[in-house]
Amino acid sequence: MKKILKNDWEPILGPEFEKPYYQNLRQFLKEEYSMRVIYPNANDIFNALHYTSYEDTKVVILGQDPYHGPNQAHGLSFSVQPGVRVPPSLQNMYKELKADIGCEIPNHGYLVKWAEQGVLLLNTVLTVRQGEANSHKGKGWEQFTDRVIELLNEREKPVIFILWGRHAQAKKKRITNPNHYIIESVHPSPLSASRGFFGSKPFSKVNRFLSSIGEKEIDWQIPNL
């Protein structure tokens, strides 16, 4: 059978694709992609795992489900394709980045540079119908992405988990290994950012922790396109 994942996620996550829940999810997605507009493009569904391998993951930024507007989602949480307006939550992340560590605010929202440095930009649900937020909730993706979190939790080498908002914080119970570091606050959404996201300094906290364990810090500056 053709391998879905192209790096070190395949041997540890590959068995999920054979499980009944995933077979059901696959059938559901086949029908959805053939009958509706679904985001992201089917080839981009696993981009978070393709860009950031298991061993290279230093940080996890957990999102909910993909953006549901045209040309936005490309498989990385919070990130949008080049040429698309930066969504409000990401605008707030950029504002906090500037306040926290002085990063200039870029002219786009394409976060691949973070992913390539070991920031796993993972949504808990990996697909969505156009214009319908949470439309693929409860179809099996949660079980799959819970497994991703469990596999990272099993790792000896520390991982920093960034949990913004209640939805992400619900995953905290899966992070039981004391080696790991959890950063929590309200979500960067305009609805909640002023209640504790602004001023929470997550980006400098990440780099301080990485530095303390002898790991290379993340260069958070996204260059203009």
From Swiss-Prot:
GO cellular component: cytoplasm
A GO BP entry: base-excision repair, AP site formation via deaminated base removal
EC number: 3.2.2.27
Keywords tagged on the record: Cytoplasm, DNA damage, DNA repair, Hydrolase
InterPro entries cross-referenced by the UniProt entry: UDG_fam1 (IPR002043), Ura-DNA_Glyclase_AS (IPR018085), Uracil-DNA_glycosylase-like (IPR005122), Uracil-DNA_glycosylase-like_sf (IPR036895)
Catalytic residue positions: D65 (proton acceptor)
One Gene Ontology MF term: uracil DNA N-glycosylase activity
Location relative to the cell: Cytoplasm
A Pfam family annotated for this UniProt entry: UDG
Reaction(s) the record says it catalyses: Hydrolyzes single-stranded DNA or mismatched double-stranded DNA and polynucleotides, releasing free uracil
PROSITE patterns to which the protein is assigned, alphabetical: U_DNA_GLYCOSYLASE
Class of the enzyme per the UniProt entry, highest EC level: hydrolase
PANTHER family recorded: URACIL-DNA GLYCOSYLASE
Protein task: Excises uracil residues from the DNA which can arise as a result of misincorporation of dUMP residues by DNA polymerase or due to deamination of cytosine.
Family membership noted in the UniProt record: Belongs to the uracil-DNA glycosylase (UDG) superfamily. UNG family.
HAMAP family according to UniProt: UDG
NCBIfam families in the cross-refs: PRK05254.1-1 (NF003588), PRK05254.1-2 (NF003589), PRK05254.1-4 (NF003591), PRK05254.1-5 (NF003592), ung (TIGR00628)
Protein name, per record: Uracil-DNA glycosylase
Species this chain originates from: Bacillus cytotoxicus (strain DSM 22905 / CIP 110041 / 391-98 / NVH 391-98)
